[in-house]
Amino acid sequence: MVERLAELERALGITFRDRKLLQTALMHRSLFNEQPHLLSNLSDNERLEFLGDSVLHFVTTTWLFQQFPHQNESTLTSWRAALVSTKGLAECAATLNLGQYAFLSRGEDTPKGRQRSKLLADLFEAVIGAIYLDQGLEAARAFIEPFLHERIGTLQTAVLDPTTRLQEIVQSRHKQLPKYYLIDERGPDHQREYVMAVTVEGHEYTGTGPSKKAAKKAAAQAALADIDR
């Protein structure tokens, strides 16, 4: 185990004062479900993940605010949501091969299990939490910001359609997906018109179009227009 942690420290570019924090960051809950006796002197990584999530959001928000002083709130929110999404964090974790260092139950310990996006994202957040506790906010910031610099270019060049932008904003703020549904369908077959609605935090927004997809985009755009105000 000592060599395993030392190897990860080299990959992270960080030497921990309290290496047990790094060890805890790698402890998946499944291990304790399978071997509950371990709980007497070890704990899973969920508390560190919780802390790391908050540190990550703070550092990412501050970095975006400082790097893009003229960008509007809606765009910054979309970028932040993409940067801290499960997919995005899993990609960051994969560059460090975090999955291979995780302590898992026998049921989870498979090549596929170690590469699950949720597992990797949780590990990444837990490691951030461990860095923060061991060495403070500036060390955590120094660890996080290179990943932000690396990934922001892709987000800037990507043209997000309204439904994607709305989904990222709603997920970031409310941890849930927008809900779309068909309200009306009218007109002759050769000139069909659809009316779609989307519900965001109890508010309904509608849009029309020659296809359900177009109407869905229009509804999302209406929601974004209200959110951006």
UniProtKB/Swiss-Prot annotation:
Q: Name one GO molecular function term.
A: double-stranded RNA binding
Look up the record and give one Gene Ontology term from the biological process aspect.
Answer: regulation of gene expression
Q: List the subcellular locations.
A: Cytoplasm
InterPro entries on file? dsRBD_dom, RNase_III, RNase_III_dom, RNase_III_sf
Identify the residues that bind Mg(2+). Answer: 49, 122, 125
Q: What reaction gets catalysed by this protein? A: Endonucleolytic cleavage to 5'-phosphomonoester
Cofactor(s) listed in the protein's UniProt record: Mg(2+)
Name a single GO cellular component.
cytoplasm
Q: Which residues form the RNase III domain?
A: 5-136
Q: Which family does it belong to?
A: Belongs to the ribonuclease III family.
Q: Could you describe the subunit structure of this protein?
A: Homodimer.
The protein depicted here goes by the name Ribonuclease 3
Source organism (scientific name): Chloroflexus aggregans (strain MD-66 / DSM 9485)
